[in-house]
Amino acid sequence: MSRRGKIVCTLGPATNSDELILALVEAGMDVARLNFSHGDYADHKAAYERVRVASDATGRAVGVLADLQGPKIRLGRFATGPTYWADGETVRITVADCEGSHDRVSTTYKKLAEDAAVGDRVLVDDGKVCLVVDGIEGDDVICTVVEGGPVSNNKGISLPGMNVSAPALSEKDIEDLTFALDLGVDLVALSFVRSPADVELVHEVMDRVGRRVPVIAKLEKPEAVDNLETIVLAFDAIMVARGDLGVELPLEEVPLVQKRAIQMARENAKPVIVATQMLDSMIENSRPTRAEASDVANAVLDGADAVMLSGETSVGKYPMAAVRTMSRIICAVEDNSTAAPPLTHVPRTKRGVISYAARDIGERLDAKALVAFTQSGDTVKRLARLHTPLPLLAFTAWPEVRSQLAMTWGTETFIVPMMTSTGGMIRQVDKSLLELGRYKRGDLVVIVAGAPPGTVGSTNLIHVHRIGEDDV
């Protein structure tokens, strides 16, 4: 494995065939994102199955992420299709169900007329169009267009500063989550997280279905930034979703929030994704801007586990080129250094201390790899956050753990039989690494595991081993 940083690709109309999904995997996709804000269940099921087939065909671990819409507020539909709101026009956004016209359109947020006040801003399509509330008349919020632009069906609305009372999980989200879990997705992302308690609502649905998978908190609201530390602790991973975040917060604050979120996630051994507009110009062009290349590189330098493509791979003209370009940028950064900003965290847990010790032993002895046996992936994540230049190989008996670790920095995961003894683990390391062809007898590796084997949370062992030697 040469590239350590991971790539998340959003699937959509631009990648909706067996051949295109296979090409995405071959180009470097590590995690496939199913965006439940768009498409229907048939689309998502077909995409999921294509990813699984492509993963098996290539032998590459590819995770599947279900991204829930969350309490996203949207415009309704326009009867005559897309329109253009010009500066100075008056338009009405209504909570009543209606067929939209140029100057009156519905919204999915049925409490807008209650929550809005004169002077509030209403931002459409990630802030491309800006309205100001002039008044309320019954079900209608009357607005003046202050920054005009094109609008079309189902465009998102942001209400910065407004106290939105929507629940963390809508009825649609509950249905989508149930479907995604039954489908077999590996990861779930929750949109518009505001507090650590939001994850409990997701867990309640998961427990009813009878299947828990890691939950990713998407940072998109000012409340999430205010509660960042407790959200990082409560959730399994973090996504810095800069589109809505950049609408809800002053634009100049977003890079600082990104750096703070990445660092805090790493301090707590939680994987972190940086998302939105990373190579946005490649939706239409075969090459990114230099600024976009720098954006991807800086996310890698900050220590992000993964960077994400959205419209570039879902609706863009050059999805494969976007993945290959992102991969080249990541590799160029890593060819210079795999280091990330130093952690201030002082490990206090057994697994935390062991991960630091294993890294130090491996680097000082010039080992060829760190090998971690894992039941849940936790020990591997603790090793990954240290950004060691040594290859990080995870061995697990659980296919779902292999797919979940596809999002974790620098990790290459292998399915092995359930181990029952330390000697069995070491023999399995020899067998797997020699079969891989990148290692030879006599190579030094550092093994991290738990004794007795097979117990979640039992990591307590570091073993320095030369491949092929009977040193149990």
Curated annotation (Swiss-Prot):
ATP binds at N35, F36, S37, H38, R74, K155. Pathway: Carbohydrate degradation; glycolysis; pyruvate from D-glyceraldehyde 3-phosphate: step 5/5. One of its GO terms (molecular function) is pyruvate kinase activity. K(+) binds at N35, S37, D67. Keywords: ATP-binding, Glycolysis, Kinase, Magnesium, Metal-binding, Nucleotide-binding, Potassium, Pyruvate, Transferase. The record marks K218 as: Transition state stabilizer. Substrate binds at R33, G243, D244, T276. It is an enzyme of class 2 (transferase). It catalyses: pyruvate + ATP = phosphoenolpyruvate + ADP + H(+). Coiled coil: none annotated. Its cofactor is Mg(2+); K(+). Homotetramer. PANTHER family: PYRUVATE KINASE. This is Pyruvate kinase. It comes from Mycobacterium intracellulare. The lineage of its organism: Bacteria, Bacillati, Actinomycetota, Actinomycetes, Mycobacteriales.
